[in-house]
Amino acid sequence: MIAIAYTRDLKEVQSDALLGPLLSADRQGAPFDRLAWWQALEQHCGLTPLLAIAREGDDAAVLPFTLGKDGPRALANWYTFRFRPILTNGPAAPALLTALARDLARTHSRIVLSGMPDEDGSATLVERAFRVAGWLSIREECDTNHVLTLQGRDYQTYLSGRPGPLRTTLKRKSGKVDVRVLTHFDPAIWAAYEDIYAESWKPEEGSPAFLRAFAEAEGAAGRLRLGIAHVGGEPVAAQMWTVEGGTAFIHKLAHRESAKSVSPGSVLSAALFRHVIDVDLVSGIDFGTGDNPYKRDWMELVRPRYSLTLIRPAAPRNWPFLAKFALRRLARWAKRG
């Protein structure tokens, strides 16, 4: 028999004999799928969690929500590379997701899940489960994800395939920049990163406390790769990566605008790419979301991220939204001729 529950108590979930291990680093190979990530979002970013859980025997399906003004939405923010449901590997797990969709219809008429991947089938799985349960699903591209699949290449082989201007920059500027790659958290280096970030082209940091807590935890677990670049003894560029499950994740990077002429960001990136490829032996690198032009110099694949708007079509509150959506679609068709 399928049991369905909703909880805001993440400590209770952590102590659960089935869910605690399922949502731990032992079972999940990316930080965004773990309970610790959601706990940090709650503690530092003000996102109140609501976990929707369906379970039967040793199988479970978990949809991590936070409540927005229009209903549940993905428990995620700008630090999250992608959002997806977490399921056990048993054959009953997809049916549990459908059971959740049916139960959610009792109390909600609209759910928005942004940042969903589909290279792993996640968006399609959620769409199918909710449609079977009587929901309408509207899928739209909302972001892009730049990635690199190494396919056995070492760093030098990878570098030889980079654009000529980038390789020229690295050849000319590498001798002018001193770089270090740390595999542990260092408070002094982190302070330098925060100082560099404040003088960079980047917008104001959304939650410095979240980022530092994450870096400290990843450092303690041995997954942190913290890069720092100096010119003339002054720290001028810094980057934060993590490595796990055969993938390196590029979380943050910044350089001082005053040092732009010596390309410290590119030189530091090269050092980190070399480290994760030749030392950590990763099979892939994930540059997160956003279509920044510089990502194309380093990455080779672009994957879409989707927003799923899940709607109960019979709910009157959804009719204006559905009418506007239909008009937008008609306008697109008319524009195509």
Residue ranges with predicted function:
Residues 78-119:
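A gly/proline- and charged-residue-enriched helix-loop-helix capping module
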Residues 2-9, 66-67, 124, 128-157, ...:
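Active-site/acyl-donor-binding loops of N-acyltransferases
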Residues 98-102, 201-320:
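Aromatic (often tryptophan-rich) hydrophobic motifs at membrane interfaces
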Residues 47-49, 106-110, 224, 279-282:
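Short, high-confidence coil segments that cap the C-terminus of an alpha-helix
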Residues 2-73, 116-145, 149-261:
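A conserved beta-strand-loop-helix scaffold within acyl/acetyltransferase catalytic domains
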Residues 111-114, 180, 284-286:
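Short catalytic-loop micro-motif centered on adjacent basic/acidic residues
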Residues 42-44, 102-105, 136-139, 276-277, ...:
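A general structural signal for short secondary-structure junctions and capping/turn motifs
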